[in-house]
């Protein structure tokens, strides 16, 4: 991939999101439709109620359009890019469905958990079919895991889409983390010569950078489940296509720790009737300790950056 193509991809995705996001914000404000705050969430987040959400709508469209025109120009509209774009859009639609219920019904819960889970599983199954149809080699350095690998794909994609969704609780947190995560995979894709994956990662980085000025504290718009579910599933898909599945556990260490904090909190409370942490996901515990959102964001971004750099360096060193 030439510097010109990379630059145009990055700038195109950035500009589409950055220039059109103000119009989307004005539209949602005019409709007086905004984020509903969970009753069990931090009381100090109540002031965020009414903030426009579903910002993921625009940054998903921006990334898809950019991948489309650059891919057509470079002759890279193939199964690999198609699988990644399908994942981004499919999980975005799942999140859009969930967000719409919350917004237009003026409630803090979307559709039922089993409905969301089923939709996520179906999306992952379709990706698995595309994955197999396109003849991608199985991961883990093995030749054929058969149905087990298909089940792993579903588990990985559903798991990380929900992990990123749980992490999206502070202004700008997931936007910054996802940018770092896609940057790490961009390096791996370029080293492996996977230009379609590199194109996708560049488009995602560009669109997230365009979204960040409107999403950092104080956020003018949230990405919503539409954005967070799409980002998590897309990261899982990229890791799968690059055959570095397990790398996401480290590159996405913050998502993993946020999810583990929720699992441990629930398990500990059921066993003892007491809370292990002040509040989960764990970023809320740091808030209750007096940390500002900017401080939490900065520390978590640094952790993500170090984890991403170490993972990439290790993979490149080991060959």
Swiss-Prot record:
Q: Which GO terms describe its cellular component?
A: plasma membrane
| Pathway listed | Cell wall biogenesis; peptidoglycan biosynthesis
Enumerate the subcellular locations listed in this protein's record, separating them with semicolons: Cell membrane
**Molecular function terms in GO for this entry?**
metal ion binding; phospho-N-acetylmuramoyl-pentapeptide-transferase activity
Q: Which Pfam families match?
A: Glycos_transf_4, MraY_sig1
Q: What is its main location?
A: membrane
In terms of domain of life, where is this protein from?
Answer: Bacteria
**InterPro entries listed in its UniProt record:** Glycosyl_transferase_4, PNAcMuramoyl-5peptid_Trfase, PNAcMuramoyl-5peptid_Trfase_CS
Q: What is this enzyme's catalytic activity, as reactions?
A: UDP-N-acetyl-alpha-D-muramoyl-L-alanyl-gamma-D-glutamyl-L-lysyl-D-alanyl-D-alanine + di-trans,octa-cis-undecaprenyl phosphate = Mur2Ac(oyl-L-Ala-gamma-D-Glu-L-Lys-D-Ala-D-Ala)-di-trans,octa-cis-undecaprenyl diphosphate + UMP
Q: Which parts pass through the membrane?
A: 1-21, 53-73, 77-97, 117-137, 140-160, 172-192, 195-215, 221-241, 249-269, 298-318
Q: Which Enzyme Commission number(s) are on file for it? A: 2.7.8.13
A GO biological-process term:
regulation of cell shape
Topology versus the membrane, per the UniProt entry? Multi-pass membrane protein
Keywords (alphabetical) are: Cell cycle, Cell division, Cell membrane, Cell shape, Cell wall biogenesis/degradation, Magnesium, Membrane, Metal-binding, Peptidoglycan synthesis, Transferase, Transmembrane, Transmembrane helix
Q: Which cofactor does it need?
A: Mg(2+)
Similarity annotation: Belongs to the glycosyltransferase 4 family. MraY subfamily.
Q: What does this protein do?
A: Catalyzes the initial step of the lipid cycle reactions in the biosynthesis of the cell wall peptidoglycan: transfers peptidoglycan precursor phospho-MurNAc-pentapeptide from UDP-MurNAc-pentapeptide onto the lipid carrier undecaprenyl phosphate, yielding undecaprenyl-pyrophosphoryl-MurNAc-pentapeptide, known as lipid I.
Q: Tell me what this protein is called.
A: Phospho-N-acetylmuramoyl-pentapeptide-transferase
What species is this protein from?
Answer: Limosilactobacillus fermentum (strain NBRC 3956 / LMG 18251) (Lactobacillus fermentum)
Gene designation: mraY
